[in-house]
Every structure is written in structure tokens, then in C-alpha cells.
Amino acid sequence: MESGYNISNRKRFAKITGGSMNNSMKKNIRHFFLLAALAAGTIHLVNRFIDMTAEMKNILKTESGSYYHWKNGSIFYTKRGSGSPLLLIHELNPISSSYEWCRLVKKLEKHYTVYTIDLLGCGRSDKPYLTYTNYLYVQLLTDFIHDVIGERPDVVTTGNSISFAVLAQNMNPNLLASITAINPPAMSSFDRTPDKYSSVKKTLLELPILGTFLYNVRTHESNIQRTLQKTYFSRPQLVSSKMLDAYYEASHMGKSHGKYLMASIEGHYTDNAIGHAVKKLTIPLYIIESRSMKDAVTIADSYAHKNATVETAYISNAGLT
């Protein structure tokens, strides 16, 4: 049998080693949380630095326009020229803003009363923490036309913004006079619905520190430049440094809260099927596609096949805008 002395020593050894292991584990846990706090603090400082430096050039001035105080946030818009109303709507993307139209407005204002708008979550407009849905923009477009323009405008959209223009007209048949869509995507791209994977991406982007950091990586100057050169313009040399600065500034105005719109886009909350609405349109719908865009002819034809009154045109050497 084991002596009492050996048993006592074993218990004492177990107590000592167990205590040292517990102390070591506690120390490791403390180190982990300390490093995590330091990492979070560093990322937060990086995020704040990006926000500050992105707006230093102040390209997107607010003095040139006005604000429409909508129920979900203040909406920046401009009004120029005289004539029948023309509303220009930029692509629904947190890097975009009404700056997208800066080259065209001066020409158009000679013949129209030209309105440009920064969509909610974009540019100089408010960027609230909410889930951005297609119907949200249907409401915004409807209310803006009723409260600000006051009559039926012709509307010009770029990219995915065709969706809520068409759906708004479908819900309010006397809302618009016509829709001109520049490089709209395939109608099938609006058929997506949120799933588990897209919901995870949305949740990650909405996180306070990590989500902002991920957003800042996505909207880094080099990534925006790549998007402009490959998607927005057919010739990369047309992307000036001022234009790059404007898109970069737009993406980071409002403490990078454009991430909430990006999160909803990634989560497919801004998508909504439009085929039925295109089919029922009774106002003119003009589709303008760039020949340099992939499947441009197929995309334009799909709209025309859905509604025989749709007119299509193609432009060479042009990108999204």
C-alpha cells in the first residue's frame, strides 16, 4: 500500500502544478485580450485616419446644392437650368454620387431643368444604419419627385438604378414621363434574394470596427481606380486623378457609413425582380448599352423582348457612364 507520506506529496505536487497551470492559463487569457484590445484600437485608429484624409480635398462640396429632409435621412440634390424636368440618378453603389453626372449637367441644363441626387447611403446624403432595400429607393424616388420636383420628370439612370425607377413607375403610373437606362445589368441579376451566405457578409460589414476595416479595404483607392478603369470607362486614361479622388471621398463621407449600403447590397436586399414591371410599362423606356460591356446586345434585347415598346441603342468606346 502507498504510504501517507507519498500520498501527501502527490497531493501537494498536484496542487502546485495545478495552480501554476491555472496561473499560466489566466496569464495567456490576459495576454490574448490585451492583444485583441490593442489590435482593435489600432484598426479603429486606421479607420479614423482614412475617414479624415479621404475628405481633405473637399471635392464634393455641399454649397452647390440643397438638402431634401426625407423621413429616413437628408438627401443632397442639385437643381440647374430651365425647361422640362430631368432627373439624373447615379448607380446604387457607396462609391458613387451625383458627381457621376458632372460632365453632362452643363450641357443638359441648357435645355432642361436638371436635378441630380445623391441616393441615401451615398455621397453627401445621410448614411443611416439600416437595411437598405429596393423598396426603400422606390419610396425615396416617389417622395422626391412629389415633394421637390412637383411634376413628371424624364429620368436617366446608370447601372442597377434602373430597378427602382421601373418599380416606382409600376407602382405609380403617373410618376415618370420616361426612363433612359444607361448600361443596365441583366434583368436576372435582380432576381437574387438573401440567403445564409449573403446574410453573413452583411453582418460582417455591419460590425463596428472590423466591418469598417473590411469596407475600407474594399473601397481602397487602388480598388476604386480598378473599378473605374475596368467597369465605368472603356479607356483607363479617361479616369482623372480628380475623378478618382471624388469617388474615394464619396465612399468615406459620413465616417465610412457607406458600409451599411454595401452590406445590404452584398446581402441582396437591394435586389428585386423587375421583369413584370418592365412588361407592364406604358411610358418610353430607352436602353443604352456600351458595346464594350460584356453581353451588351443580349442584355438590351432581353428588355426589348419583355416589352415591345422598349427602344435600344449602342455606343462604342464607352463604359458604365
Task: Locate each region found by the language model.
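Conserved loop-alpha-helix segment in the C-terminal half of the alpha/beta-hydrolase fold
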Residues: K280-A318
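Active-site loop/oxyanion-hole signature of alpha/beta-hydrolase fold enzymes
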Residues: T116-V156
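A short loop-to-beta-strand scaffold at the N-terminal edge of the catalytic core in hydrolase folds
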Residues: Y67-R80
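Hydrophobic alpha-helical topogenic segments used for membrane insertion/localization
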Residues: M25-I50
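Conserved HGGG/HGGXW glycine-rich cap/lid loop of the alpha/beta-hydrolase fold
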Residues: T78-R124
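Conserved alpha/beta-hydrolase catalytic His-Asp/Glu region
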Residues: V217-A277
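Alpha-helical membrane-targeting segments
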Residues: M187-S234
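Conserved hydrolase catalytic core segment
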Residues: G150-P194
